[in-house]
A protein has these predicted regions:
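Serine-hydrolase catalytic machinery in alpha/beta-hydrolase-like enzymes
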Residues: 1-58
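Catalytic histidine-centered segment of alpha/beta-hydrolase-like enzymes
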Residues: 33, 149-161
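Short beta-strand immediately N-terminal to the catalytic nucleophile in serine-hydrolase-like folds
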Residues: 60-65, 89
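Gly/Ala-rich beta-loop-alpha elbow adjacent to hydrolase catalytic centers
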Residues: 65-73
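A conserved short beta-strand
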Residues: 82-94
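Acidic catalytic loop of the alpha/beta-hydrolase fold
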Residues: 95, 118-123, 151-152
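Short beta-strand/loop motif that positions the catalytic acidic residue
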Residues: 107-109, 113-116, 120
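Catalytic histidine neighborhood in serine/cysteine hydrolases
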Residues: 133-152
Length: 173
C-alpha cells in the first residue's frame, strides 16, 4: 500500500476523480493474518472491492494491481465478472510463484491496460507482449512500456503516471 508504484496509480486515479482504495494483503504491513497461499489474498481483493462498493455506490469498478497484486487481482476479476477496467502494473509474467504462472489467464478480466517497465526483472517485454497477444483474441488489451524502468519503476514514476494517464484516456500520452 505504501509502495511508490501503488501511490502513483492512486494519485493518477484520484486526480481524475475516480474513487480509490488502497489496501495491504493479509500479513503485509499492519494488516492482520498471514499469507495463505493465494485463496486468502483473493478473498482480500473481494473484501476490498465490497468495501469500496459500499462507500461509492454502483459506479464503474476499476481494479488495479501491482506485481503480486496484479496476479491476485486478475484472478478475482475473472471470477467476479463486475470489473469494468483492469490495470496491471509490473505484471510478473516471467515468474513462477508457488508453482503458479499467468497461464490461468485465458481472457482479459475486463478491458485491460498493462503498464510495464521495459527492463522489468519479473515480466520481460517479450513475455508481456506474448500474454497481450494471446489475450487480445478474447478482448481489448493495451500495453504501454516505460522505457528503461525496472520492476519498481525506479526513477521513472513520472513516466509511469504519464503512461497510466495516456492508457486510461486521462491526458498525457
Amino acid at each position: 500500500m505504501h509502495s511508490k508504484v501503488v501511490h502513483t496509480i492512486y494519485k493518477v486515479l484520484h486526480e481524475a476523480g475516480h474513487p480509490t482504495l488502497r489496501f495491504n494483503f493479509r500479513g503485509v504491513g499492519q494488516s492482520a493474518g498471514s499469507y495463505s497461499g493465494w485463496d486468502g489474498e483473493v478473498e482480500d481483493v473481494a473484501a476490498a472491492a465490497a468495501y469500496a462498493r459500499e462507500r461509492t455506490g454502483s459506479g464503474p469498478l476499476w481494479l488495479a494491481g501491482f506485481s503480486f497484486g496484479s496476479w491476485v487481482g486478475s484472478i478475482w476479476a475473472l471470477r467476479d465478472g463486475r470489473v469494468e477496467r483492469f490495470i496491471g502494473l509490473g505484471m510478473p509474467v516471467s515468474t513462477n510463484i508457488d508453482g503458479r504462472t499467468f497461464d490461468y489467464l485465458d481472457r482479459p478480466p475486463a478491458p485491460m491496460l498493462i503498464v510495464q517497465g521495459s527492463r522489468d526483472q519479473y515480466g520481460s517485454r517479450e513475455a508481456i507482449l506474448a500474454l497481450a497477444e494471446r489475450l487480445r483474441a478474447k478482448g481489448p488489451v493495451e500495453v504501454r512500456f516505460v522505457e528503461g524502468a525496472d520492476h519498481f519503476f525506479t526513477g521513472h514514476l513520472t513516466q509511469l503516471a504519464d503512461a497510466l494517464r495516456g492508457g486510461l484516456g486521462l491526458g498525457a500520452a
